Amino acid sequence: VSAEDPTTSTLAIDCGGGGIKATVLDDAGTMRAQPVRVPTPYPLTTKLFIKTLVDLSKKLPQATHATVGLPGMIRHGVVVATPHYVTVRGPRTRIDPALVEQWNGFDARTALRDALGIPVIVLNDAEVHGAGVIAGKGLELVLTLGTGLGCALFDGGHLAPHLEVSQAPVRWGLSYDTYIGEHERRRLGDSLWS
């Protein structure tokens, strides 16, 4: 983007437990490119995560900044905890303590800003999705269903502190992710799920 062209564009990346999707949006929120998707690679080190997102960005038009949604608890672009990326082979597999140590406290915003060379915002994935659908009036709760359950709360259009409910227990030994996530949808089938 040249100095004479005030157009801004956003590299929008949705990082899920099963896939990582990206596209570029103009300042009105309209897609400027067809979305691209890759399966989430496991085991997913922070280094492989950054490489995967950079590789995806190279398949899309250049953007002036990026917004990245990650599963889990994210504070100021830093990963507090993530449920899927700390597992050996993805959701519902064994947790790797070395990955937990690597991800917890990982400054994703700074790492992505340095790798992409543009300003980056990193939020919880449900918060990013919610920002695109809320009316901006009153108290709004956004729930997303994907690999697991995502949750975002907005008050008067402002994002409230994140409440991570995906790993909360529903029944003895069952989290919300396990109870109503993608694995359960596949088990029940679309006709029962709807």
Segments and roles (model prediction):
Residues P6-T8, G117-I118, G136-E140, T147-L149:
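Short coil/turn connectors at secondary-structure junctions
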Residues T10-D14, H65-T67, E140-T144, G150:
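Short glycine-aspartate micro-motif
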Residues C15-G16, L70-P71, N124-A126, L145-T147:
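Fold-independent oxyanion-binding glycine-rich loops
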Residues I20-V24, G72, L149-D155:
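Short beta-strand scaffold segments in enzyme catalytic cores
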Residues P41, T46-V54, K58, H65, ...:
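Glycine-rich phosphate-binding loop and adjoining helix at the ATP-binding site
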